[in-house]
A protein has these predicted regions:
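Substrate-binding surface in catalytic domains of secreted glycosidases
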Residues: 1-88
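Hydrophobic, secondary-structure "cap" segments at the distal end of domains
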Residues: 76-144
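Generic preference for hydrophobic/aromatic residues in regular secondary structure cores
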Residues: 13-22, 114-117, 121-127, 148, ...
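Acidic-enriched, low-complexity/disordered segments with a strong bias for Aspartate over Glutamate
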Residues: 15, 59-63, 83, 107, ...
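Residue-level detector of intrinsically disordered, flexible termini
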Residues: 24-26, 35, 93, 111, ...
Length: 192
C-alpha cells in the first residue's frame, strides 16, 4: 500500500506535522484514528514487482522425476545466488538458461511460474501476466468498493524482448488493461 502524498495535518500527531518523510506506519496509524479527516485524494495502491526471485531449497533432492523439494511452499535455505548477489533478478536471466526455461510450470496453489535446476540447486519464480491477473482479480473481489491503483515496480526487469516467450512487455500490458478495467468496468466480485 502506498500512502497518500498529501495528508491533512489533522491526520498527523503534532510531532509528525513537520517531519518529512513521514514513516508509512505512522501515516497508517494516523489514518485509522480519524478516517473522517481523510483527504479526498486518498488512494491505495498495490505494488507489483517485475523481478523474479531465486530460492535454494533447505533440503535438496536429486529425484529426476518431479519437483520434489524444488517447489514453492517448501522450506528454503538462507543464502543468495552467488552470480547475482541478490535474491531477485530480471526474469530474462532465468528464461535464457535452458535448464530453467524447459522446467517452467505454473504453480496453481501459489499462482506463480516456477522453474528449477536440481544440478545447480536453485529454483526461480515469477508472476506471469496470467498469474498476476488472477491474483489481482482475487484481491479486488475481496474489496470491491475500494478504489485502488496498480503500481509496477522494477519495470526494467520486465521481458521487453520476449526472451521468455510470453510476449514483449506482457505483464505491463496486462496491468494497464486490468487497471482500466478496474477503473471503468468492474462491477462485482463475480468479475474475475
Amino acid at each position: 500500500m502506498i500512502p497518500p502524498t498529501l495528508l491533512s495535518k489533522e491526520l498527523l500527531t503534532p510531532d509528525l506535522q513537520n517531519v518529512y518523510p513521514v514513516r508509512l506506519a505512522n501515516t497508517i496509524w494516523s489514518m485509522t484514528v480519524n478516517p473522517a479527516a481523510w483527504s479526498s485524494t486518498t488512494s491505495f495502491a498495490v505494488s507489483i514487482g517485475m523481478s523474479g526471485r531465486w530460492y535454494r531449497p533447505r533440503d535438496t533432492d536429486s529425484d529426476p522425476h518431479g519437483l520434489g523439494n524444488y517447489q514453492l511452499g517448501k522450506p528454503c535455505a538462507s543464502e543468495q545466488r552467488p552470480d547475482i548477489q541478490q535474491q531477485t533478478s530480471p526474469i530474462v536471466f532465468a528464461c535464457t538458461m535452458p535448464s530453467y526455461n524447459k522446467s517452467f510450470k505454473v504453480d496453481t496453489t501459489f499462482q506463480a511460474v516456477v522453474g528449477y535446476d536440481k544440478v545447480e540447486g536453485w529454483l526461480f519464480t515469477f508472476d506471469s501476466a496470467e498469474t498476476l491477473r488472477k491474483k489481482l482479480c482475487e484481491a479486488k473481489s475481496n474489496v470491491t468498493a475500494l478504489k485502488l491503483n496498480i503500481v509496477a515496480a522494477n519495470i526494467g526487469s520486465e521481458d521487453y524482448t520476449n526472451q521468455c516467450g510470453l510476449g514483449p512487455l506482457s505483464r505491463l500490458r496486462m496491468l494497464k488493461a486490468l487497471s482500466l478495467y478496474f477503473a471503468h468496468n468492474y462491477t462485482s466480485s463475480a468479475d474475475k
